[in-house]
A protein has these predicted regions:
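Extended acidic/polar regulatory tracts at the flanks of large eukaryotic scaffold/adaptor proteins
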Residues: 2-299
Length: 299
């Protein structure tokens, strides 16, 4: 799917991970043969694109399904490989899982209390009231991970360590950061067709033209060949980092809408659904993860 017509272009060799929420991404004005070219959106083109996908979604399924795009087998298998590694249940008895939980604890406390390290001791901190400050629904965060699994914990850690400014803005207030993040992790995995766990989202994602196109576009972005600037050890690691970047943009979109709203927890699910619909339309218009960030956050 082509992006909307450009007004200006920015060349990205990598994502500047400190610029989320408050600052514009760093730009590189020299041309790099392996850089991602990011076009700043034409507002009218973006508006028209949204309208066209909204109209397509109202055409009956028995007509539109003939026009649905599909993800080729090689790319889907690459997504399955990613899912097999990271989309697994969180287990309290697994040392590596508990260690990751500890990383989230330490990152949060380092940001909020400005200390180099707040050591995580599983016996003391695996169940602790401080988890509720991060937006978990109970003092035992493992209960929240039943739906999103280990991936949802990994993505919360990614946000806290790569976008500390975003974390400090979202955590500790009236925004249920952890609960929202876990929901977004579940949504992305379900959108990609990789959700093997039974949860309420499975019944809420009927195929629409926008949703199917977003799935194919996201799957393509995640499995495109790595750039020279992406020095992760494997294609799975590259795909995971890209998925984490999309996750962070989803969270920023949701937080932005929450800030505009009356902040009524009773309408939070409605806000979630509206954010998902907007994000999926933008995914349809974005040829890369970097372009998705620009479309979503520079409007």
């Amino acid at each position: 799917m082509n992006s909307t017509p450009p007004e200006t272009s920015t060349h990205y060799n990598n994502v500047n991970e400190e610029n989320f929420v408050t600052d514009a991404p760093a730009t590189h004005h020299h041309h790099h043969p392996h850089a991602v070219v990011v076009h700043h959106p034409n507002p009218w083109g973006l508006y028209l694109g949204r309208c066209l996908y909204a109209i397509a979604d109202h055409i009956p399924y028995f007509i539109m399904y003939r026009f649905f795009p599909s993800l080729d087998e090689e790319r889907f298998n690459a997504l399955l490989s990613l899912s097999n590694q990271y989309n697994v249940p969180y287990k309290k008895e697994e040392a590596a899982h508990v260690q990751l939980l500890g990383s989230l604890w330490e990152a949060h406390h380092r940001l909020f209390f400005h200390q180099d390290k707040i050591p995580f001791v599983a016996a003391q901190h695996a169940v602790h009231v401080d988890w509720k400050e991060m937006g978990f629904q109970a003092s035992d965060p493992s209960t929240d991970f039943r739906g999103g699994g280990l991936l949802s914990l990994q993505q919360l850690c990614y946000l806290a360590t790569h976008y500390p400014t975003a974390w400090t803005k979202m955590a500790g207030g009236d925004f249920l950061l952890a609960a929202a993040g876990i929901n977004i992790s579940m949504r992305l995995i379900t959108l990609l067709g990789l959700n093997t766990r039974k949860n309420v989202l499975n019944a809420q994602l009927p195929p629409t033209y926008t949703r199917v196109t977003a799935r194919v576009q996201l799957g393509t972005c995640l499995t495109d060949p790595p750039l020279e600037s992406e020095n992760e050890n494997s294609k799975d690691a590259v795909a995971l980092r890209r998925l984490n970047e999309v996750y962070c943009v989803y969270l920023e979109l949701l937080f932005r809408e929450w800030q505009k709203s009356d902040k009524n927890i009773l309408t939070f699910n409605t806000l979630l659904m509206e954010t998902y619909e907007e994000a999926e339309r933008l995914l349809c218009l974005a040829p890369s993860v970097e372009q998705f960030r620009v479309l979503a956050l520079e409007q």
